[in-house]
């Protein structure tokens, strides 16, 4: 199986949206399993967002890695019912790759750049500058845990991020 190309091949928003799955054959499913986790029925007063600082495409495997990192830390620090966590973006953008044959005799097999549109290899979420990527709702005493969880998630993403308190700032001792 071929390895995954580096994210620098896909992170810039330089192509038009390519999202119509009904016209594209063989689009892989996104790796993101759950988009909302934690205690879904409770109300939490503090809402903290992870916000992108520039426009970018985030691949589905990076979103899943960020989700796993943040959710694991929140579960450990707040308990299973002590938080609500949501991924706010969905990977609609279909990523394509024109596979090139390499090695001995590749010139006989390969067509070069003829029909170079590419086959679908994955999906990505298009994020605008200032858009929330992840959101955590917690009680005021668990705010440091939410902040650390978002910091850990930000390390898995290909964009510099800011942590913004959207709701409940007056309840925190900052």
Curated annotation (Swiss-Prot):
Gene Ontology molecular function terms on file: structural constituent of ribosome
Alphabetic keyword roster: Ribonucleoprotein, Ribosomal protein
Endoplasmic reticulum listed as a keyword: no
GO cellular component: cytosolic large ribosomal subunit
Keyword Ribosomal protein found: yes
GO biological process, one term: translation
Family label: Belongs to the universal ribosomal protein uL16 family.
Name the UniProt record assigns to this protein: Large ribosomal subunit protein uL16
Organism: Methanocaldococcus jannaschii (strain ATCC 43067 / DSM 2661 / JAL-1 / JCM 10045 / NBRC 100440) (Methanococcus jannaschii)
Encoding gene per record: rpl10e
